[in-house]
Regions:
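Contiguous, well-folded functional domains in the mature portion of proteins
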Residues: 1-111, 119-315
Length: 315
């Protein structure tokens, strides 16, 4: 098995850090060994495995894992919407809400993950924000990008969207991959203001979306279960916000109302237990990603940043 670490650039600290991987030995064995490969294709990628583990995380006894997890990963309990002692299960802790103001929304004079203001002026509306806490890869031109996880592998947009005509509209556009780890805040939000339509479910497997797995096969991203929501923005045009289920995360819950206008930074939904991923697609010429995201992504480094921070500006 390989011991290659996962490194990322921490935007706030301005340093490169090494990721502390939850369940690292299990993930590496599953994706980097012959024995693990047999288990992966026989059980781990299938919904029953994730269902069983998710079921266990809904047991009341699972609440005993909450405080040790907080301590081990040094989570900031001051930003939680309620006391960690009040979570009845580990899953309830996992998809926890945050206090208003815990995630300021870029381009808003006030606002938070819980309640962004309805409008912020013309300049603020031109700023898009990161849809989730996590490690982000920003590709300004998807058609020109190759090997961002492994050399020689290209992102198959038509397979990912499950719609060749829709893929053609985003060809040559920009893509953001936001990878959430189990230690992260697991609610996802709208990166732009606009009107979302009903999400479309594309069923699939539940492979890991860790770089440990994606360095082996990028196509796990379009083999996994996912949901695609189109958001019509008056500034950014049509934006596709896509949530991907992963090992131990078969449950993707949407909390927004289709057809109702949403504010930038407004909650869209949540993942239940595990690691997971959000992919955001923009049509060509509609956004210019921030330079730091593009620079580090080109170097093969994900950028750790939080929901509500700047993603880029309208093109």
């Amino acid at each position: 098995m390989s011991a290659e670490p996962i490194r990322y650039f921490h935007r706030a600290k301005q340093v490169v850090e090494t990721e502390k991987i939850y369940g690292e030995n299990w993930v590496r064995w599953t994706y980097e060994s012959k024995g693990g490969s047999l288990l992966l294709h026989g059980l781990a990628k299938r919904h029953i495995a994730s269902w069983y583990y998710g079921w266990r995380m809904n047991w009341r006894a699972s609440a005993n894992k909450v405080l040790p997890f907080i301590v081990e990963y040094d989570l900031d309990v001051d930003e939680f919407a309620k006391s960690p002692f009040l979570f009845k299960t580990f899953n309830e802790f996992f998809y926890r809400a945050l206090k208003p103001g815990a995630r300021p929304i870029a381009g808003h004079s006030t606002g938070s993950a819980g309640s962004p203001p309805a409008g912020s002026g013309q300049d603020g509306d031109r700023i898009a924000v990161l849809p989730a806490d996590g490690r982000h890869l920003a590709l300004q031109n998807l058609d020109a990008a190759a090997g961002f996880y492994v050399k020689g592998q290209r992102f198959d947009l038509a397979s990912f969207l499950g719609d060749a005509a829709l893929a053609a509209k985003f060809a040559g556009g920009a893509m953001l991959i936001s990878r959430l780890c189990p230690v992260d805040y697991h609610r996802f939000h709208f990166p732009v203001a606009g009107t979302p339509v009903k999400p479309r479910l594309i069923n699939g497997f539940l492979y890991s979306v860790s770089p440990i797995a994606l360095r082996r096969k990028l196509d796990y991203l379009w083999q996994n279960k996912r949901m695609v929501t189109l958001v019509q923005s008056p500034v950014f045009g049509s934006v596709a916000v896509c949530e991907i289920g992963a090992t131990m995360v078969g449950s993707i819950f949407q909390t927004f109302i289709p057809g109702r206008a949403v504010a930038k930074g407004e909650e869209k939904g949540l993942f239940k237990f595990g690691g997971s991923c959000v992919i955001t697609l923009f049509q060509p010429g509609k956004i210019k990603f921030d330079a730091d995201l593009v620079k580090h992504s080109a170097e093969g480094l994900e950028v750790y940043a939080r929901m509500g921070e700047r993603l880029g500006v309208a093109g």
